[in-house]
Amino acid sequence: MHVLVLGAGQLARMMSLAGAPLNIQISAYDVTTGDVVHPLTLHLLGHGLEQAIEHVDVITAEFEHIPHDILAICQASGKFLPSSEAIKAGGDRRLEKTLLDHAGVRNANYYVIETREDFNKAIEHVGIPMVLKSALGGYDGRGQWRLKDAAQIETLWQEMAACIAATPTQAIVAEEFVPFQREVSLIGARGKEGQIEVYPLAENIHVNGVLSLSTAIDSPDLQEQAKHMFTAVAETLNYVGVLALEFFDVDGQLLVNEIAPRVHNSGHWTQQGAETCQFENHLRAVCGLPLGSTKLVRETSMINILGEDTLPASVMAMDGCHIHWYGKEKRAGRKMGHINVCGDYSGELQRRLCALANVLDEKAFPAVHEFAKKWQA
């Protein structure tokens, strides 16, 4: 099988690594340049989408912010999975909210803002405090504001109005502020025949809006809620592939915060922690192969490497530590790679995270240090 991935970043790279043992070949299409490249070496393989489509069996995507003309071409080929509808919903908060409502899953109360009058209505409908998010283009904490009191209204409106004016069809989605205890996510896969497999929930810690630490957890009640909502969304979309749902945990009740119609950062732990990783299961699904087991095989955490292109040699020497570099040029705050940390028995994972805190810079890895302080207290 030959799969074309829309996007030439680290997710396409890791799909390529997962596909090789299954004899699944991956090419990556750079939606900005129009180049078709090898996802590991970035060696140029060709140019132009239509020609690339002719030579592959399946088309999929590694991110949701894809120009609609490209999506239309891929959808018309009959080879694109999950679907242009799913990708669009992941890239537009208005469509995402409509999808969640249609699927009947809990999400924060919201109101769509396009004008100053809409902002006034949103304040009445949603209330203060509220979180405001750009409908298009926002990710990793970008394009977001928080309205805490009425004194901020005019200042925030000026910023939001500029955001709306800068991009055609842009809007702001106002959401009620949710006083959650923690953020969790569920990664799952749905096959062509409708079979569904989900991984254990992961608890996620964000720093400045960017995922820093993700740990697989055992929470049967939350797992059941999450799987029910995952199934509702996946079946509403007739989804094929890996899908991620991010949740707020509010006193033991889950609310969907976001969906991602693709393999996801909070699922990278599955590379070492699950029977079948998310990248392999995505390829299995879109290629019409049986889904692999999502069973947890060892306790695992994933640590994002942000803005760093080297690590102390002692990290590689530590038992249970697996480093995954993305081959990117160093840039402040950029996702450069991740570390999967595993433990085979209770407490071993936690002790290894504490050991990592002793050698990793606190400024670059704040969540690991915060975890260590709490664990050792």
Swiss-Prot record:
Residues 97-287 form the ATP-grasp domain. It catalyses: 5-amino-1-(5-phospho-beta-D-ribosyl)imidazole + hydrogencarbonate + ATP = 5-carboxyamino-1-(5-phospho-D-ribosyl)imidazole + ADP + phosphate + 2 H(+). Pathway: Purine metabolism; IMP biosynthesis via de novo pathway; 5-amino-1-(5-phospho-D-ribosyl)imidazole-4-carboxylate from 5-amino-1-(5-phospho-D-ribosyl)imidazole (N5-CAIR route): step 1/2. Keywords: ATP-binding, Ligase, Nucleotide-binding, Purine biosynthesis. GO terms for biological process: 'de novo' IMP biosynthetic process. Pfam families: ATP-grasp, PurK_C, RS_preATP-grasp-like. It is an enzyme of class 6 (ligase). One of its GO terms (molecular function) is phosphoribosylaminoimidazole carboxylase activity. GO terms for cellular component: cytosol. InterPro entries: ATP-grasp, ATP-grasp_carboxylate-amine, ATP_grasp_subdomain_1, PreATP-grasp_dom_sf, PurK, PurK_C, PurT/PurK_preATP-grasp, Rudment_hybrid_motif. ATP binds at residues 93, 133, 138-144, 175-178, 183, 206, 257-258. Its EC number is 6.3.4.18. Homodimer. Catalyzes the ATP-dependent conversion of 5-aminoimidazole ribonucleotide (AIR) and HCO(3)(-) to N5-carboxyaminoimidazole ribonucleotide (N5-CAIR). Belongs to the PurK/PurT family. This is N5-carboxyaminoimidazole ribonucleotide synthase. It comes from Vibrio vulnificus (strain YJ016).
